[in-house]
Amino acid sequence: INAAHAFVDESGEIGGATATCEAVTRITGIPINYYVDFSFDAVAHVIDELGPIEFTIPDLYGDGVGMVYDDPVQSLHINLPPGDYQMNGQQAVWLMRYRHGNVNPSTGVFKGYVNGDSDRVEMQQKFLKAVVDQKVNASLILKIPSIFKDISSEIKTNFTVSEVIKYSKYLADFSSVNIHSYSLPGEYSSDSANGDVWIPNMDEIRTMVQDVFGYPADNITTDNPKNATRESGSSSSSGIS
């Protein structure tokens, strides 16, 4: 699905959110009608607008270091020692971008999440639920239009302002118990052409989609996950980002 976002077709157009929605529908059979594509700046902006988020950074490796990583090329410097935080927007972005620590110059290796991106996604989901539990309430509804206006230049979406206002009323009764997370069945694959990617198990996905979402398996329009970006397309060379 990440690969679909970075997919470049024959005309040179980048797939983006539209291609991602198409890929999800082809793989799961579930229609995706709306999307919001956030930049890192938008994420930081929203968290700062909502106010600090209480969140605990675990001692991932038992060494008291926590999440520390430096990438001068991207001007990325993550510094989140273990402990309790009143997390601001910049720290929230660090949390979501963190994958592993710096390379140990003596050994040439680095410490990272035990289960790789699966653990990273789980950490992101925990933070999302913390945001929902602490900040999503009836009073937020009044702030939604102004927040949407403020970040409009930092996001890509097919929501109109009127639709945002229309659907925001449902936030009044929303909590993290309404959020259910599922992972597409499959396995990791790594090669020089595609990098590290997750190959979906289409048979198991059909079963999951029927059991969890109630959509019939015959809605799934691809048996080849590598072609999920387009019916006649090929697999993207992009790795997991």
Regions found by a protein language model. Give the residues of each.
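Non-catalytic, solvent-exposed segments at the cell envelope interface
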Residues: 1-241
